[in-house]
Every structure is written in structure tokens, then in C-alpha cells.
Amino acid sequence: MNEELSTFFYVPVGTMMLAIAFPAILLPTPNRLITNRWITIQQWLIQLIMKQLLSIHNTKGLSWSLMLITLTLFIGLTNLLGLLPYSFAPTTQLTVNLSMAIPLWTGTVVPGFRYKTKISLAHLLPQGTPMFLIPMIIIIETISLLIRPVTLAVRLTANITAGHSLIHLTGTATLTLSSIHSMTITVTFVTVILLTILELAVALIQAYVFALLISLYLHENA
Amino acid sequence: MLSRVVLSAAATAASSLKNAAFIGPGVIQATRIFHTGQPSLAPVPPLPEYGGKVRFGLIPEEFFQLLYPKTGVTGPYVLGTGLILYFLSKEIYVITSETVSGAALAVLVIYAVKKYGAVIGQFADKLSEEKIARLEEFKQSCIRYAEDGIDFEKEKQAVVQKRHYLFDVQRNNIAMAFEVAYRERLHTVYREVKNRLDYHISVQNMMRRKEQEHMINWLEKKVVQSISAQQEKETIAKCIEDLKLLAKKAQAQPVM
């Protein structure tokens, strides 16, 4: 498990399939209207997040709502489960994140260019730019557009991996310090606790951010 | 705790597998059997009020009950402690940085559950209660609407029962109107007939009066014609003598 955390491009297939499939157990499907506490809170959280995410879309854009909900839940749950000791977070692998980001980004941009070419091309030039800057701006905006899937994937990977690495390293420091000078392990242990809190927050926030950005790209391109 | 989830998931999976289609290999298309199970899940069994009892938030009570006959109350605790110490001392479980992060996570989780567990549970219960209240309110409003409809209908039926009074009154009014019209016309007829008869009577009266006047005038004219001049003189002298006699008689008697 330790080796898997420190390499980007090593793909452990068996544990990854398990790790990707496991969060589904934590999201039960209710077969009744008034459910138990677990499902009620899940439903409430999903409603809370999705109201924010989907309020900007028109009817056509709302056909993406299931995709966005699934995305948020998957990334959030896998990130959170990755914080458990001896577990594996698939979102630390660039392959997983790229395979999520590239199709989703393409799905927002390519239909936009196909059906509303003028509007999509118009997004490349903000309003009110001076004439002599236009060629530069167009090139810069095109590059920023084309690099979006990479940024989506790398942002998620880097955040989660960095958090895991920090916790791992601080934990090792705690262990090493315990034999050198036992009193300082309180400091490092508190650091580990704080980092864990941060990581919990980051896990959820990154999930939300991923889905939000895809939703924004979708909204831009109609 | 998760063991119960797995058991219940396995139970539902097994039952659904039992009801699902069975496709034997090498069977021809026509004999495939689909949808043999019951398509509905109703009535859904009620949710249990409380979850299963656990100790340390992880180990179900049934485990302790399982070991109770052989090892008494302290059995599972001794087993747990022994296992942990065994794993640690034999380095089957190695203390790594994961242990530290796991310990930190455990501290956080236990703190959060102890502090906010009940609050979150009550919040979830409140959400469910609000949902039930909304549905109940809707149901009550439907029932009220139906009851109002029934009352309205009953009221209208009672009104319809009393409709004959209205018809009787209208019938009486119309009969009176007919009566009045009949009498008016009768009176008009009477008046007209009387007019005609009066007319004839007045014509007759007028004719008779005219005849009388005519006759009187004719008679007077003839009488006046028949009186000669001689007769006239004699008549006037006779009258003067009568008047003188009367004057003497009057002088004889004093005037009262």
C-alpha cells in the first residue's frame, strides 16, 4: 500500500476494482418512502449539494444531473474511504482522474462547438479587449480551454495525493520521534489529527469542485 | 456493525436471485423464462425502531452472547486483548505510519460520534417526521375536500327535496294571475255591453223627447193660430173684470 501511494503511474488493478466498487455499498437504495437515518441524511445531503450545482442549468443541461450527482458522490466517497488506514483511494491515480475528466470535458465542449459554434467560439474572447491584444488573447484562451481536462484531473490527483503523503510522512515522523524523544509525539500527533481534519474537508471539497467545474463548462457551452 | 449490513445485503440478494430469471446454458430461446418473481415489494416490512446493539461501536452483541456459555462475561474481552497483544508482539501487525493515521482518525471519529451523534440522529428523525407531516397534511386535506363535497351534495339533495314548495307557490301565483285576468276581461265585457245598451236607451230617450217637443211646439203653434182676434179681445176684457173683482175683495180684507 505504501508503494502504491508514492507512484503516479503504477496501476494496481485488483485492489483498484475493489476500491472503486466499495462505495456503492455505502449508498443503499431505499425501497420505502420514510427511510432509516442513514438514507435520510444521504438524501438530504444530496439535495443540499445538487440544488447549488444544478440551479444554473436550463432543461437541456439538467439531463446531466444524474452524471453530476454520481460524480460528486463517487469522488467524495472514494476520497473519504481513502483516508482510512490500509485503504486505497483510486482518485490518487492520475489514470482514474484523467479517464473521468477527459470524457466529461469533451462531452461538454464538443456538442457546444457542434451545435452552437458561434457562441462557443465567442467564449474565447472576453468582452471589451483592445484590438491589438485579440490574437494573443485568442491563443491564450484556446490553450486554457484545451488544458482544462488535464487541470481537472491533476488538481484532484495532486490534492488527494499530497494530503495522503503529508499524513503518511507526519505519521512516520511520529513513530521515529517516539523512540528519540517521546514528548514531541504529542505535537506531531496533533498535527496528524489536524491534517486528517483538513483531508476530510479537502476530500469533500475536491469532489464538489470537480462536479462544479464540469457543470460550469456545461453551462458555458449550453 | 458492517457484518449485519453484509448479512442483510446477502439475504436480499439471495431472495432476489431466487426470484430472478434462471437461464440454463444451452437452452433454446423459446424456453427462456423471465420475470417469474413477484413484481411488487409491497407491503414493505416496517423499519426496526432501534439498530442492533453493539459494544465499542463495532462488535455486535450477538458475539458476546455466542461466547457467553463457554467463557462467561470476560471471555470476549480476554480474547480481544489476547489477539491484539499477539498480533503486536509477533509483529503480525506492524506499527507503521498507517497506525498513527488510523489512531488520529479513530480519535476524530469517536469524538465526533460522541458529541454530534445524537444531534444528527434527531435531525434525521426530524426530516422524516417533516416528510410524514407533509404527506399526512396532504392526506387530511384530500379527506377534508372529499367530506366537504359530500356535505355539499347532501345539502343540495335536501334542497331538491323541498323543491315542490317552490313549484306549489309558483303554481298558485300563476292560477291567481289567470283568475285576475279572467275577471278583468269579464268586467270589460260587462262594461262594453252596458255601454251599448245605454247608448240605445239614450237614443230612445232622445227620440221621445224630440217627439214630445216637436208635438208640443206643433200644438202650441196650431192653438196660437186658432185663436182669432175677436176671441182675443173678449178674453182680455173678461180678464180685466176678474182682476177688478179681485181688487175689491182684496181691499175689503186687510193685508196681513
Swiss-Prot record, chain A:
PROSITE patterns: ATPASE_A
Stored Gene3D superfamilies: ATP synthase, F0 complex, subunit A
Keyword Mitochondrion: yes
Transmembrane segment boundaries: 8-28, 64-84, 93-113, 127-147, 160-180, 197-219
Any one Gene Ontology cellular component term annotated for this protein: proton-transporting ATP synthase complex
Lipid bilayer topology: Multi-pass membrane protein
Compartmental location: Mitochondrion inner membrane
GO terms of biological process kind: proton motive force-driven ATP synthesis; proton motive force-driven mitochondrial ATP synthesis; proton transmembrane transport
Keywords in alphabetical order: ATP synthesis, CF(0), Hydrogen ion transport, Ion transport, Membrane, Mitochondrion, Mitochondrion inner membrane, Transmembrane, Transmembrane helix, Transport
Pfam family, one: ATP-synt_A
GO molecular function, one term: proton channel activity
Coiled-coil annotated residue ranges, if any: none
Subunit record text: Component of the ATP synthase complex composed at least of ATP5F1A/subunit alpha, ATP5F1B/subunit beta, ATP5MC1/subunit c (homooctomer), MT-ATP6/subunit a, MT-ATP8/subunit 8, ATP5ME/subunit e, ATP5MF/subunit f, ATP5MG/subunit g, ATP5MK/subunit k, ATP5MJ/subunit j, ATP5F1C/subunit gamma, ATP5F1D/subunit delta, ATP5F1E/subunit epsilon, ATP5PF/subunit F6, ATP5PB/subunit b, ATP5PD/subunit d, ATP5PO/subunit OSCP.
UniProt function note: Subunit a, of the mitochondrial membrane ATP synthase complex (F(1)F(0) ATP synthase or Complex V) that produces ATP from ADP in the presence of a proton gradient across the membrane which is generated by electron transport complexes of the respiratory chain. ATP synthase complex consist of a soluble F(1) head domain - the catalytic core - and a membrane F(1) domain - the membrane proton channel. These two domains are linked by a central stalk rotating inside the F(1) region and a stationary peripheral stalk.
Family, per entry: Belongs to the ATPase A chain family.
Protein name: ATP synthase F(0) complex subunit a
Source organism: Loxodonta africana (African elephant)
Gene: MT-ATP6
